[in-house]
Amino acid sequence: MSDMSRSTIVIEAPMSKVSEVLFDLENYPEWSDSITKVKVSERDEGGRVTGATLTIAAGALKDEVSLSYNWDGAPERLEFELEDANMLTKMDGAYILKDLGDETEVTYELSVGVSMPIPQMMVTKQEKTTIDQALAQLKEHCEG
């Protein structure tokens, strides 16, 4: 995943709490300003979300995206991949968690493609802004 933007933050909460928040996709709108609605379309036999449609508003980017989720690396890793969208042609990423005892290191990787002619530099800048905002809001929610 070398073409992905990424950032890492340390959250002052145990991994069990951070993963509980991250894995509760339906409640993302409670803590993420850029995700305004989540509609679950599929779950696995364990009840985990494997497909969902998210309404996102990240800066100038507003779209409704259908994502598939891969839980093979859980609880240390949750991956997602774009299935369908209006503006986006790609939205692949992962949350990677590292247990530090009373704290958790969280890395968010994201790669986005758009259907409009936008310079890659601007797309990468928006990816980084989205990542940093998501990590800051996750930290605030988990520590608050």
Spans of model-derived segments:
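Hydrophobic ligand-binding cavity/cleft-lining segments
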Residues: 1-47
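Amphipathic alpha-helical hairpins
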Residues: 9, 87-88, 129
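Amphipathic alpha-helical protein-protein interaction surfaces
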Residues: 14, 24-27, 102, 127, ...
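Generic recognition of short, well-ordered alpha-helical segments
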Residues: 23, 92, 121-122
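A short acidic/glycine-rich loop-to-helix N-cap element
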Residues: 111-133
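Hydrophobic-ligand binding "helix-grip"
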Residues: 29-30, 37, 42-44, 55-103, ...
